[in-house]
């Protein structure tokens, strides 16, 4: 169930990018639910909508041929497009909190508007604060394996716990993607801002992106090793 939740939140993230692109006029070649060969597809107003064979998340493909086409798109539109994904995850968290309040019978202006914003802000603060603690306690990092393992234990078959966990995980997705590390959304925004500082800095796009990928993959591998170690220790205990 947690794996399906992660896939769904990835889709929500990409849907946020898609909506932001449509709102700002950024050209989209394809929007797909899932990956791999398309089972169903339809082209509407220049965008190909696909339902792909592997229903794991989704993706948005911009209608560009190379990096130069990307930089012809106005800076504000590129940044708005990149922010769309994290905002999509934040919006999902807000809806999740509203849903919990509705389930509990709390129907008021406070429970529908103020409380979701307040609780989401608290989640954001705690997650951002915890990022700083990672440098003090790097052995506490957890990756996908740990999320699935711990999340499955927490959620079980309880719908309320599932919603609570999805809210927390969605806000985590938003914060993680805003980290200033290419190829994450935050890293791409930083690279785009180089354009404002000095257009010649744009030549750093590719080397920074490659470096970012290496660091990100290294971090994920490190987190996976820690997760597997914790799970193994738990099984042996």
Language-model segment annotations:
Residues 176:
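Positively charged, phosphate-engaging catalytic surfaces used for nucleic-acid and nucleotide handling
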Residues 68-90, 94-173, 190-211, 215, ...:
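Functional transmembrane alpha-helices
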């Amino acid at each position: 169930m947690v794996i399906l939740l992660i896939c769904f939140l990835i889709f929500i993230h990409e849907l946020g990018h898609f909506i932001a692109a449509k709102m700002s006029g950024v050209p989209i070649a394809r929007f797909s639910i899932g990956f791999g060969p398309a089972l169903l597809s339809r082209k509407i107003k220049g965008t190909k909508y696909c339902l792909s064979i592997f229903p794991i998340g989704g993706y948005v493909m911009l209608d560009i041929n190379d990096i130069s086409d990307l930089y012809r798109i106005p800076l504000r539109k590129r940044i708005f497009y990149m922010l769309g994904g994290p905002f999509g995850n934040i919006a999902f968290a807000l809806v999740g909190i509203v849903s919990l309040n509705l389930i509990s019978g709390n129907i008021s202006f406070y429970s529908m508007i103020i409380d979701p914003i307040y609780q989401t802000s608290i989640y954001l603060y705690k997650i951002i604060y915890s990022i700083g603690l990672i440098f003090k306690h790097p052995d506490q990092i957890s990756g996908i394996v740990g999320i699935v393992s711990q999340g499955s234990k927490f959620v079980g078959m309880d719908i309320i716990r599932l919603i609570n966990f999805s809210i927390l995980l969605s806000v985590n997705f938003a914060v993680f993607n805003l980290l200033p590390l290419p190829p994450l959304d935050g890293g791409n925004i930083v690279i785009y801002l180089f354009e404002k500082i000095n257009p010649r800095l744009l030549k750093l796009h590719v080397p920074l992106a490659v470096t970012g990928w290496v660091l990100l993959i290294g971090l994920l591998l490190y987190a996976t090793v820690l997760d597997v170690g914790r799970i193994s220790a738990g099984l042996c205990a």
